[in-house]
């Protein structure tokens, strides 16, 4: 019973995905990533502007690659 329900959900999902991504009525699929990448406004993206914390500033739990400019955080940025 569970397998049948899972198969029905998978078929419905794949059918909906194909319908949403179809470019035209012939069923050709569009590469959404390539289209979106050249339409992006890189100046408006906040991901391009990485803000880091200077050494000696509290950064939280020890981790590598956190908000510190050096990439090392052991309660304070190193």
Curated annotation (Swiss-Prot):
This is Omega-conotoxin-like ArMKLT1-011. Disulfide bonds join 52-69, 59-73, 68-77. It comes from the Eukaryota. Omega-conotoxins act at presynaptic membranes, they bind and block voltage-gated calcium channels (Cav). Expressed by the venom duct. GO terms for molecular function: calcium channel regulator activity; ion channel inhibitor activity; toxin activity. The keyword Ion transport does not apply. InterPro entries: Conotoxin (IPR004214), Conotoxin_omega-typ_CS (IPR012321). One of its GO terms (cellular component) is extracellular region. Residues 1-22 form the signal peptide. The presence of a 'disulfide through disulfide knot' structurally defines this protein as a knottin. Its main location: secreted. Coiled coil: none annotated. Keywords: Calcium channel impairing toxin, Cleavage on pair of basic residues, Disulfide bond, Ion channel impairing toxin, Knottin, Neurotoxin, Presynaptic neurotoxin, Secreted, Signal, Toxin, Voltage-gated calcium channel impairing toxin. Residues 23-48 form a propeptide. Belongs to the conotoxin O1 superfamily. It holds the Pfam family Conotoxin. It is found in: Secreted. It comes from Conus arenatus (Sand-dusted cone). The keyword Disulfide bond applies.
